[in-house]
């Protein structure tokens, strides 16, 4: 379980994340939604231990998150790889630093996505670069997978493959967090939706409960529509 307990991180403009407590369970895919400046990115960075907290703490499986680096996979459209490496070299590099990284799985996914393993990552299209990130993330055998805008540059077939991979990972009791503005693409994928606004959690609901109320994500986000839609 991933636990945020009274986590607070505010910037000089008073934006960020206000005192927040929430738990994320294994076997669930949670959508993290919110406008720019809502606290969504700050929450993800805090979980990834990319910034110091003003207050509170974060644990993954009862251990401080900063001690669980090898258990976390971060997939982002911005890319967290070394652009001058080839996809093959990148896989070799990850093998050295992540004991649970499956090179076999990585190359299988690259082949499935039809990505060249010999060209430098920088020379690939944005969509192809994201496919490298997705392949690496799902080959890490991580217990927590965080995806930040994972569908933006993917074609329809790659989106379908990525959704299938997400569902497969849930069977392995992995915690999955997805941050995106494209609510239509995650509505049938996520089990739970968390909406942030003004640095606080405004909504936290299971999708089954939402559907039983005869609502969808767009209806849930309606009060925040000017903020969520660009």
Predicted features along the sequence, with ranges:
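Conserved structural motif at the start of ABC-family nucleotide-binding domains
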Residues: 2, 17-19
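The feature captures the beta-strand-to-loop junction immediately N-terminal to the Walker
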Residues: 33-35
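Helix-to-loop junction immediately C-terminal to a conserved catalytic motif
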Residues: 48
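Conserved ABC transporter NBD signature motif
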Residues: 55-68
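ABC-family P-loop ATPase nucleotide-binding domains
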Residues: 78-123, 129-132
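Catalytic Walker B motif of ABC-type/P-loop ATPase nucleotide-binding domains
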Residues: 145-149
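H-loop/switch region of ABC-family ATPase nucleotide-binding domains
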Residues: 180-181
């Amino acid at each position: 379980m991933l636990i945020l307990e009274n986590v607070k991180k505010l910037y000089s403009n008073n934006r960020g994340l206000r005192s927040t407590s929430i738990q994320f369970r294994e076997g669930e895919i949670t959508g993290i939604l919110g406008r720019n400046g809502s606290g969504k990115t700050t929450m993800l960075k805090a979980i990834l231990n990319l910034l110091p907290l003003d207050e509170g703490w974060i644990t993954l499986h009862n251990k401080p998150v900063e001690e669980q680096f090898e258990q976390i996979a971060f997939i982002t459209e911005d890319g967290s790889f070394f652009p001058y490496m080839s996809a093959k070299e990148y896989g070799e590099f990850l093998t050295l630093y992540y004991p649970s990284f499956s090179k076999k799985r990585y190359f299988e996914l690259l082949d499935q996505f039809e990505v060249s393993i010999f060209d430098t990552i920088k020379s690939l299209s944005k969509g192809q670069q994201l496919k490298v990130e997705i392949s690496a993330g799902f080959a890490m055998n991580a217990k927590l997978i965080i995806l930040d805008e994972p569908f933006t540059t993917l074609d329809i077939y790659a989106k379908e493959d990525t959704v299938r991979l997400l569902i497969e990972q849930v069977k392995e009791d992995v915690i999955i967090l997805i941050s995106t503005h494209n609510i239509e693409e995650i509505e049938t994928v996520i089990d739970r939706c968390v909406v942030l606004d003004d640095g606080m959690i405004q909504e936290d609901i299971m999708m089954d409960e939402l559907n039983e109320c005869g609502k969808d994500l767009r209806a849930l986000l309606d009060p925040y529509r000017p903020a969520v839609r660009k």
